[in-house]
Amino acid sequence: MKKLSLYISLLCLILTAGACKNKTGRPATASSELTDDALMDTVQHRTFLYFWEGAEPNSGLAPERYHVDGVYPQNDANVVTSGGSGFGIMAILAGIDRGYVTREEGLARMERIVSFLEKADRFHGAYPHWWYGDTGKVKPFGQKDNGGDLVETAFLMQGLLAVHQYYINGNE
């Protein structure tokens, strides 16, 4: 197994090294590189877009997975994740702060999320790892794991606490 891992690592290294050359064979010029600020802007905006535009329509929460081709062999396109949604909520707050959407639009999304969570399955206060976003019913994480997930609940609560602090003085 170690040899196989070594061979795969070497193959990846060789392929990566070959792919790094530009067409002229000369080093890239500084003008073709992103500045740190431009890179940060790009990462923040695209992260925001994933959670904003990619949200499950009913719940407003983050999808468990995204298939670029739109084909979901397990018919799970509407499955949402609790922990990933916590991260998504914080990304939306960053998007509001960066001006990608207004505070009002962000608040409307948060209200949709909280309304969903009020009715969604939970277990002694803990949310499951996954739900069906259209129903709020738990999607079992495994054969013997169909209840609350404390770690994922903590990630979700982090996001909701951040929302509380962000809007604590109103929507201004």
What are these regions (language model features)?
Residues 1-8:
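Bacterial N-terminal signal peptides that target proteins for export
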Residues 16-19:
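C-terminal motif of bacterial Sec signal peptides marking the signal peptidase cleavage site
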Residues 26-77, 124:
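Low-complexity, Ser/Thr/Pro/Gly-enriched N-terminal "stalk/linker" regions
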Residues 36-39, 43, 77-84, 148-155:
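Secondary-structure capping and boundary motifs in well-ordered enzyme cores
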Residues 63-79, 126-148:
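Carbohydrate-binding/catalytic loop surfaces
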Residues 85-136, 163:
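Post-signal peptide N-terminal segment of secreted/secretory-pathway proteins
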Residues 133-172:
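Internal, well-ordered domain-core segments that constitute the primary functional module
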